């Protein structure tokens, strides 16, 4: 059996150890030895964009928080008008380099698309600095509302974080939040912070059973 090969390593600002590993053509990003995402199972990352980018207007501007393996950015670009903009925010520089290097072909080189605008930084800061800017915001940060790998990401899923997301969206704008597991109280939290919220159970691997993830969507009311 072929071993997993470490292709790249990085430390996030809070000290979380990230690894890009490869085995027989499959790539996985791990956080402190726990798998976060895989090139083999990425359907939920694609759906994260499809759920809130399917009816975008000319000139639309969207934000993706968390680059991952690039699949959400690719899915958003596939739905974005020719004159639209997709702002991709990623905190860890090495993750960006991996997506420009060995990971690039898997999602069809989305960072090379002229509609992509790459921001290396904290998505929470990017959200707080925006007001009535985005038609859609997609967040694939950590494991979602819970359980968190890094506590620095908790703010995004609090009342204050959701209020900031709402403020960054245009009227009628939509947010999609990826979650590894269900969080029973999160729907009510979204609703009390001004969203018409829904929950979607999504297969990790299209057309197959097994692992399911949750995507919370909300429209700004």
Predicted regions and their residues:
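Conserved beta strand-loop-helix elements of the APE1-like EEP
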Residues: 217-221
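Glycine-centered, phosphate/nucleic-acid-interacting loop/turn motifs that mediate DNA/RNA or nucleotide
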Residues: 173
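N-terminal auxiliary segments of SAM/dcSAM-dependent transferases
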Residues: 1-30
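Surface loops and adjacent helix of pleckstrin homology
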Residues: 32, 41, 100-101
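Conserved SAM-binding loop and adjacent beta-strand
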Residues: 35-48
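Short, basic/glycine-rich phosphate-binding loops at helix/coil junctions
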Residues: 25-31, 140-145
């Amino acid at each position: 059996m072929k071993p997993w090969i470490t292709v790249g390593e990085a430390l996030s600002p809070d000290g979380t150890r990230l690894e890009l590993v490869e085995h027989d053509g499959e790539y996985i990003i791990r956080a402190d030895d726990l798998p976060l995402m895989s090139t083999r199972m990425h359907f939920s990352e694609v759906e994260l964009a499809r759920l809130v980018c399917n009816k975008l207007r000319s000139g639309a501007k969207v934000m993706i928080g968390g680059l991952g393996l690039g699949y959400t950015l690719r899915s958003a670009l596939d739905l974005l008008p020719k004159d639209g903009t997709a702002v991709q925010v990623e905190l860890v520089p090495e993750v960006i380099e991996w997506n420009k290097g060995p990971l690039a072909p898997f999602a069809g080189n989305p960072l090379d698309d002229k509609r992509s605008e790459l921001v290396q930084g904290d998505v929470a800061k990017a959200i707080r600095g925006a007001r009535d800017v985005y038609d859609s915001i997609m967040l694939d940060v950590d494991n979602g509302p819970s359980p968190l790998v890094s506590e620095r990401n908790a703010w995004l899923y609090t009342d204050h974080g959701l209020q900031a997301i709402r403020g960054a969206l245009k009227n009628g704008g939509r947010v999609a939040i990826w979650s590894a597991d269900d969080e029973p109280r999160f729907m009510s939290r979204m609703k009390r912070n001004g969203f018409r919220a829904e929950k979607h159970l999504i297969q990790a691997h299209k057309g197959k059973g097994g692992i399911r993830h949750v995507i919370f969507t909300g429209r700004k009311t």
